[in-house]
Amino acid sequence: MKHTELRAAVLDALEKHDTGATFFDGRPAVFDEADFPAVAVYLTGAEYTGEELDSDTWQAELHIEVFLPAQVPDSELDAWMESRIYPVMSDIPALSDLITSMVASGYDYRRDDDAGLWSSADLTYVITYEM
């Protein structure tokens, strides 16, 4: 399925840079403290666009989420994202072969409200692709 290829292209590009992170194909349900720093690449909201007749065009939100221990400030999440993730996202040749467009759509902070184990920064893009 194309979704696997999309995630793999981003993960491969990120893994080529020495980030020191544990990478996840999909958003993990649980973390071990040894996993930090962690980066998850996943898709949400994938749906058929129906824009063109006889076309199988889809759109989804691509997430690149950085996870660090809960006690780190947002500024540390920002520094991690700005120095290790954002520069890679601007040049992924394997991804450009799979998509028709990619537009930055958001940046959000999250906290583990259940166990208090992690904090995260989630960089999102809206991507369009042919299935």
UniProtKB/Swiss-Prot annotation:
GO BP terms, alphabetized:
symbiont genome ejection through host cell envelope, long flexible tail mechanism; viral tail assembly
Tell me yes or no: is Nucleotidyltransferase among this UniProt entry's keywords: no
Highest taxon in the source lineage: Viruses
The cellular component terms of Gene Ontology attached to this UniProt record, alphabetical and capped at eight, are:
host cell cytoplasm; virus tail
Q: Does the keyword Transmembrane apply?
A: no
SUPFAM superfamilies of this UniProt entry?
A: Phage tail protein-like
Q: Which residues form the signal peptide?
A: none
Here the disulfide bonds are none
Arranged from A to Z, the UniProt key words for this protein are: Host cytoplasm, Late protein, Viral genome ejection through host cell envelope, Viral long flexible tail ejection system, Viral penetration into host cytoplasm, Viral release from host cell, Viral tail assembly, Viral tail protein, Virion, Virus entry into host cell
Q: Where is this protein localized, as stated in its record?
A: Virion; Host cytoplasm
Q: Say what the protein does.
A: Plays an essential role in tail assembly by capping the rapidly polymerizing tail once it has reached its requisite length and serving as the interaction surface for the completion protein.
Q: How does it assemble?
A: Homohexamer. May bind to major tail protein V, and /or tape measure protein.
Family in the record: Belongs to the lambda-like tail terminator protein family.
Designated name of the protein:
Tail tube terminator protein
Instruction: Give the organism the record lists.
Output: Escherichia phage lambda
Q: Which gene encodes it?
A: U
